Every structure is written in C-alpha cells, then in structure tokens.
Regions:
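Non-heme Fe(II)/2-oxoglutarate
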Residues: 1-69
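Catalytic core of non-heme Fe(II) oxygenases with the double-stranded beta-helix
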Residues: 62-167
C-alpha cells in the first residue's frame, strides 16, 4: 500500500469541489447496494452514493496523478459519498491491477469513523490511516483492506474519488 500526501494541485481540488457541489444536487448517483457485491457490504448499515467523474475532471486528475499511479490500459474514476453507517468489508481488489482512494474532505474527525485499515502482505500487523485531505492511497499489491463504519454523529459525507484499473 502506498500513501501519498498532497498529490493534486489546489486548482484541481477547487475544480473537483465545484463539480461535486453541482453533482450532489443531481440525480446521477447510484448506491453501493446496487454496485457492490454483498460480501463488501457486511457490517454496513448505510450506503455509499457513487457517481462518475466528468470526462474533463477525469482527464485532469489522471494527468496530475500520472507519475504516482501504476500503468494501466483502462481505468474507472468515480466519486463516492460515504453516508452515516456506511463501511466496506475486508477485501483485496483481486480483479484490479490497482485500486486507489483520494480523500477530499477538508476536515475529518477520527470519531467519525471511516478509517482505512489494511494488512500488508508481508506482515500480520494491521495499519490504518484517517481520511486526510488530498491524500492518495494506492493498493497495487492486492492487500487486504476495509473501511470502518461512518459514525451516525457526523453531519457530513466522507468524500472520496475511487480509481480502479481492471486486470
């Protein structure tokens, strides 16, 4: 697992924020109940809203991340809005060359949950990272990982961009 801080320019972060602000009010969202396998929704009492990034944002994003993402021939780039109670169960992203998560919240309190936890392939010790603004986590070794449930005591979404490159 690679954890990279401050990966995007502030200009692109602002462009993403504008698109998200407009998109949140639209009807272009699906849910984890529809898109995720049941095994990924164990222990989750909430849902994640999922929507494609625009072609423009995807192009800008992938251009800025060109030197940090593994090579790929095809890639999916989606916004995820993690609602109260949402989580994702232990899994390894086995059908993907890599999976990556970009954290977009300006502020995230540890008490709100949504902690990304993984088990390095060469260790029995789990590691974890709190959602941190403009941080990218790249899983290119199919490491076991999960996200802890989002607290019902938060009034905000856990906002991420998910990037997946199929095998």
């Amino acid at each position: 697992m690679k954890v990279l801080n401050n990966v995007l320019s502030e200009d692109l972060i602002q462009e993403i924020s504008k698109e998200l602000k407009n998109k949140i009010q639209s009807d272009s969202w699906g849910t984890s109940e529809v898109f995720w396998e049941p095994s990924l929704r164990l222990n989750s009492t909430g849902t994640v809203l999922i929507s494609n990034c625009s072609d423009r944002i995807q192009k800008l994003l992938l251009s800025e991340l060109e030197n940090v993402l593994p090579e790929y021939s095809e890639v999916f780039v989606k916004y995820h809005l993690w609602q109260k109670g949402s989580a994702i169960s232990c899994h390894q992203d086995m059908n993907y060359k890599f999976g990556a998560t970009l954290y977009l919240n300006d502020v995230w309190d540890l008490n709100w949950g949504g902690i990304f936890v993984w088990k390095p392939n060469d260790s029995n010790t789990m590691k974890a990272i709190a959602p941190t603004h403009n941080t990218l986590v790249v899983n290119d070794e199919s490491e076991l990982h999960f996200v802890t449930p989002i607290s019902y005591n938060t009034d905000t979404f856990r906002v991420t961009i998910q990037i997946f490159a199929p095998i």
